[in-house]
Amino acid sequence: MANLKTKTWNFHMKDYNDLVKKLSQLKPRVSIENLPSSILQVFKKEVNTDYNSVDLTCIDKKLVESLMPFQREGVCYGILKNGRCIIADEMGLGKTIQALGIVHYYRNDWPLLIVSPSSVRYQWSEAIYTFLPSVPTHYVHHYTTAKDTFGDAKIVIMSYDILKRAISSLERHVFGAVIFDESHFLKSPKSARSVAASVVASQARRVVLLSGTPALSRPKELYFQINLVMQKFLGFHEFGIRYCAGTFGKFGWEYGGSSNMQELQLLLNRCCLIRRIKSEVLTQLPSKIREVVILDPKLIKTETQKMKKIAEAVQRESFKNSEGNTALLQHYRETAEVKTKAICNYVNDLLESDTKFLIFAHHLTVLNEICKTISSKNVSYIRIDGSTKSEERKVRCDVFQEQDDCLVAVLSITAASTGITLTAAQRVVFAELYWNPGILCQAEDRVHRIGQQGSVLIQFLIAKNTADDHLWKLMQTKLNVLNKAGLGQNFAVEKSTEAKRGNETPSNQSNLLSFFTKASVQQDSAAHREKIEDVHQLLEEDDDALITLNLDGLDEDC
């Protein structure tokens, strides 16, 4: 079959021998390069690709019901590969829930080890509590130091840094199933973390790797990851010659290039790797996917005397009086200080992915530390805050939009939430929360605008036992009022790392305001006008008085 676009011919594998035989008659006018016998064997082998043949009823019902169609296919793919696979879906497509579905299917092989960057360890436990409610909470253990013990835990979660330091313990403790999150952390086979990962994977029956950036353009970096799930894959030299444009140089063989990439992608999909990009599944995705990221509590010092006193004051005072306002504002400022280290740790891990993102914060100290972190990695970024002149904003936005190496936009929540377009990114990170959900929605829409071709991932970085606990509830209270009117900001977020998947309607302030300004014989006009003013304030203002709004009456009418 001819493909006019690519100017290539496609033949069925069963016709391979006949094709080679007939082409051989054209020598020497035609040069023929046969497929290596090991590759031929892979393609000729019968492979079950019938996803409908997989019975998912043994997986927790909550998880199965939360799967989008393409995620269900991902779970089935992993099961058809006997729980040894690489899920390489693009960022924001829900690799976590797919991995949990696969390993829960094989829970008889547990204990399960989950290895991830330190900044997202607690996202995993939150996802387990949400999507696998049948798993008792005491089954889950965060392994936080090399001297820690596994005990009777059925699910152990640790960072890559701990993995390499705990190798002696891991050699003695067999995990039947392993998940390596952000597996591009294992691209170098000689690194200490990769050596430890190899030890763990060699003992496990089920191994699932997750990576939104699987280095398909740099196949050399992918080889070790493939070997973790397929230990009888091609030898490295054979792989390097075929797919890394291997050449013999001055200092020996070099495998820094890429070759036969279309063949490699077909081979990997047949063997162990499934990858979907947003454009392929866009019809199944909401326009915005929101998720909560629980920051590493080990990096957040909430036990100081100062934080305890402020937290007690917030608990004691009502938000309807000035004392309560002052206490919460002070708590908000202190939270910025104590969560900054954890925020920067998360930013460090995001930079590993080499993809563009926006990060919003409110306090200058947080913005400054984020910028220092990015600079320390020699990554190009822009910053827009209250001190940025209007003409300079456009210049900086153009840099972010047009220059591929400019990966991060560091933005002030209040100063950069309107009037700019940054659609080159598909991820928005809120390092801090804010009183007004309307402001956050406006900030999100710097990416989610006309010209954005994909679904946008929105992440909220939450520090437990800080002002975030109160601010999140405060935001939800305000949003519940709007949602009851059927005209909310669509800010629904699951209590986990995986966003609530569903159809979303873009927020529309004009519709909301017109709803409340319509005449109604059932409403007292004076009281109604007062509530209209409250709604204006709710959506538009961002001063300290926002937290004093009395929404009870409005709530009842809605």
Model-derived regions: residue spans:
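Conserved Walker A/P-loop ATP-binding site and its immediately adjacent core
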Residues: 98, 109-130, 216-221, 362-365
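A conserved SF2-helicase RecA2
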Residues: 435-516
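Charged, low-complexity
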Residues: 1-85, 126, 130-138, 151-156, ...
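Conserved P-loop NTPase motor "coupling/switch" region that bridges the ATPase
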Residues: 108-111, 177, 185, 194-279, ...
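Conserved helix-turn-beta segment of the N-terminal RecA-like "Helicase ATP-binding" lobe
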Residues: 120-143, 229-233, 378
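Conserved helicase ATPase core of P-loop NTP-dependent helicases/translocases
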Residues: 356-360, 368-369, 375-416
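Conserved helicase/translocase motor-coupling segment
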Residues: 279-380
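Walker A/P-loop
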Residues: 82-102
